[in-house]
């Protein structure tokens, strides 16, 4: 009987991991909410980023993201002061400390967070979505909402 329970528990654990991956967006860690939509956002032609907010640390996070996109994928992104920017980052004070909302539509990406950490995690999610694209130039249209499940980080061994 114990062997049967162990087998059932292993099957449940396997499906718990495999089913979300087979359903589409594979974002690690799994966000609190994902809604996939039809279409893609083309980063090669919508390469302007605009931050509308008052947190200077976010500008450094954006600069690091742009350097990574150029180095990893050859995508040249630029900051822009125009509201017509393809990627728009906005402060949203009602979100938690590290929470974010990422909305990707065919014509615009909107990222909302209340802290630099939230913007950082949102841009890490964007990077994972770019990795999923064969040519590394587009994002799937998607809505992602996430907040940390725990208010602390587990210690890590730095090697």
Q: What would you call each of these model-derived segments?
A:
Residues 1-5:
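N-terminal secretory signal peptides that target proteins for export/translocation
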Residues 7-20:
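Bacterial N-terminal signal peptides
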Residues 24-152:
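Contiguous, structured surface segment used for ligand recognition
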Residues 157-159:
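Conserved small/polar residues in nucleotide/adenosyl-binding loops
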């Amino acid at each position: 009987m114990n062997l049967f329970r162990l087998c059932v528990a292993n099957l449940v654990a396997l499906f718990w991991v495999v089913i979300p991956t087979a359903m589409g967006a594979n974002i690690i860690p799994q966000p609190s909410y994902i809604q996939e939509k039809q279409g893609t956002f083309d980063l090669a032609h919508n390469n302007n980023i605009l931050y509308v907010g008052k947190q200077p640390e976010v500008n450094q996070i954006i600069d690091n993201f742009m350097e990574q996109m150029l180095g990893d994928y050859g995508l040249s992104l630029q900051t822009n002061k125009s509201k017509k920017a393809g990627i728009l980052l906005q402060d949203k004070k009602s979100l938690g400390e590290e929470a974010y909302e990422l909305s990707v539509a065919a014509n615009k990406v909107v990222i909302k967070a209340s802290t630099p950490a939230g913007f950082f995690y949102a841009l890490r999610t964007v990077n994972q979505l770019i990795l999923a694209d064969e040519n590394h130039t587009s994002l799937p249209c998607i809505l992602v909402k996430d907040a940390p499940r725990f208010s602390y980080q587990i210690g890590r061994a730095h090697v």
